[in-house]
Amino acid sequence: MYLEKINGPEDVKKIKIDELPVLAQEIRDALLVRASKHGGHFGPNFGMVEATIALHYVFESPKDKIVYDVSHQSYPHKMLTGRKEAYLSEQHYDDVSGYTNPNESEHDFFTVGHTSTSVSLAAGLAKARDLKGENGNVIAVIGDGSLSGGEALEGLDFAAELQSNFIIMVNDNDMSIAENHGGLYQNLALLRKTDGQTECNLFKAMGLDYVYVDRGNDVAALIKAFKEVKDSTKPVVVHINTLKGKGYAPAEKCKEQWHYSGPFDIETGKPLFDNVEEDYSSVTCEYLLEKMKNDSSVVAITSGTPTVMGFTEDKRKEAGSQFVDVGIAEETAVALASGIAVNGGKPFYGVYSSFVQRTFDQVSQDVCINNSPITMVIYQGSVYGMNDVTHLGFQDIPMLSNIPNLVYLAPATKEEYLAMLDWSMEQTSYPVAIKLPGGPMISDGSRVTKDFGRLNRYEVAHTGEKIAIIGLGTFFELAKEAAKLLKEEAKINATVINPYYITGLDEALLTKLKQNHDTVITLEDGILDGGFGEKIARFYGESNMKVMNYGLKKEFLDRYDVDAVLKENHLTAEQIVEDVLSIS
């Protein structure tokens, strides 16, 4: 077995070229077993096996620097750079992250997880190399899906000016997470069709040299191409045509479904844990499709992640032209939504919290200054969301809640969410964002009659005295739990408030609390700095009201344990009660 003997790239070079396909199969076998038990990004890694072997066969990592875009396709790279045990031994599966990480290896240069960044990052490495008078190759690896992102195109535009060694390997599998969208993919298709020979070549048009490899899963062909461009003195694109999910029939057949997988049965490809519970994605999709049937102005927008809103391939077909995928281009999604709204449409944009930061300028400039009535729904903005350091959803509250004109709402239940959507999709006075709760969806069957157009009116769910607990969104349930425990342990009848609004204060209610309360507790699912609780604390600043803010510390967490993080931040009912009693 070749893989067991590989401790670094130097061991790859010892294998004869005609034996490298054996190594490729061993890598796929290991990936398959690990994915079936552990889950992870599937299709991107299976398609990149030969290219990764060829890169390490030809180049001298880490002297030659390889930068992976997103880096979700870096599993084979990790296996060849001293981390194979994390893929061969089940007890070591969690030793590595799902993305490149300089803390793991000198062969990783950046911690990344968002798309379209590799060309710009690698261009910076190349520029620094040139300024220092050093040599060595710099290689940016980027997938065709990531080319729809603005930063990728900006990076390509700059790359031509380097006029020194810079290699851009474009892994073209004719897929993003789902199908690609955008005009540039017509050119990629033409390049594939003509074996890279067409004169209409977007890379050449940007001033880059160009090499095409049709057999992108043929390790010998890749080695030949990489040897041709090694030590080149001009920026060059090596465009390789690969098969996403190669080597596992279900993944080759259903590429979108197998972009990422949970644990599954290898023989059948069926998931071991079939989640059939209703969630906010399916609720959103059902709601929008129903709206679309009766209103042609309703438009659902995604930036390369259609299933975040529940729009699987069949649902996208059902929506037809009322569903728009702009590619991995969050900025364009927001600006497009603003344009649709200004011209009388009803745009809905669904996005992961981690990607909201990429939209900040457009939300502020193109939407809120213009007061465009868009609806923007934030998914996974929670401690219960994705837990990789590159995909944390902790920062959307301070980012969005401080933009003028925006109404940022936080439902605690399915019914509240749908009521907010009903209001937001029909009103024309405000841009609206909705932060979905983390964790399992709560549905209490209640009928929500609240008029959300009467801004910043909190709801008192239970009237008490002395202590008021304001639980925002996800943590409204925690507020109720803490109040119940206070009554059981200290006979304190606490007021419980569902604020709904992240962007504004119910000053009348907060003022009224001064009459018979001496402590206000705020709970929010995000970082405290610049967040919801600080606004409450500032309101009471010169009064005698004691304010206790609970949320998350400002820090980067990686692959964390949710319960541990909650306890560290005193976000349990028991700890909150203990804190209250300690100061009473």
Q: What is each model feature region?
A:
Residues 41-162, 298, 303, 312-313, ...:
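Cofactor-binding active-site loop characterized by glycine-rich and histidine/acidic residues
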Residues 39-48, 67-72, 101-120, 142-146, ...:
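Active-site nucleophile and cofactor-binding loops and adjacent substrate-binding regions
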Residues 108-264, 270-277, 282-284, 406-517:
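Glycine-rich ThDP/TPP pyrophosphate-binding loop and its adjacent helix/strand module
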Residues 248-357, 362-372, 470-473:
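Non-catalytic terminal/interface segments that mediate subunit docking, oligomerization
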Residues 263, 269-274, 385-387, 398, ...:
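Peripheral docking tails and interdomain loops at the edges
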Residues 1-79, 215:
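N-terminal amphipathic, basic-rich helices that act as targeting or association modules
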Residues 86-96, 161-175, 368-380:
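A glycine-rich helix N-cap at a beta->alpha junction
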Residues 29-36, 95-111, 133-139, 312-327, ...:
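Glycine/charged-rich beta-loop-alpha catalytic/anionic-binding loops adjacent to active sites
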